[in-house]
Amino acid sequence: MLENLQGKFLIATPEIDDDYFDRTVIYICEHNSNGAMGLVINTPTDLSVLELITRMDFQMANQRNYHKDQMVLSGGPVSQDRGFIIHTKTEQEFLHSYRVTDNILLTTSGDVLDSLGKPEAPEKFIVCLGCATWKPEQLEQEIARNYWLISEANDKTLFETGYLERWVEANEMLGISGVLARAGRA
């Protein structure tokens, strides 16, 4: 097995032959001998976080204090009916949280959604529907085939950079210019 990739970015290369993952950045939430799981962080859906919370019938959802234009992301092709929330550490504990790094958690329980826009909410968060998973050794094989580049993750790219700029920014962190990153196969 490669180094543990938990808490790092996977950046799709032009070698990947899968339209779903073309030009994606994936935040790896878990990586061990059982495989890997991550979330695509640069593919917005047409559903805003506000619309999602309103549909889930949380009280006073439209009066909460968060970015009203923040979109729900398509986290991957697996379990697309399930929510995955990457967020910064908070004082509040949530029902189903998993520590990815010292400051980043992955939560799959609805209580984190109910907290959004309230004082106890995580300062920064991403809401995804679906995830990406790999069987044991599958991700390592894809990396060996040059489908993915590996980069250190950072809060700016994860939470602040515009969704569609995240792939170029992640490449630039590796010294690959935007023009080279966009080059495809002939």
Curated annotation (Swiss-Prot):
What SUPFAM superfamilies does the database record attribute to this sequence? VC0467-like
Kindly list the residue ranges recorded as spanning the membrane: none
Q: Which Pfam families match?
A: DUF179
Q: Name one GO cellular component term.
A: cytosol
Matching InterPro entries = AlgH-like
Question: What NCBIfam families does UniProt report for this protein, alphabetically?
Answer: PRK00228.1-1
Q: What family does the Swiss-Prot or TrEMBL record give for this protein?
A: Belongs to the UPF0301 (AlgH) family.
Protein known as: UPF0301 protein APL_0232
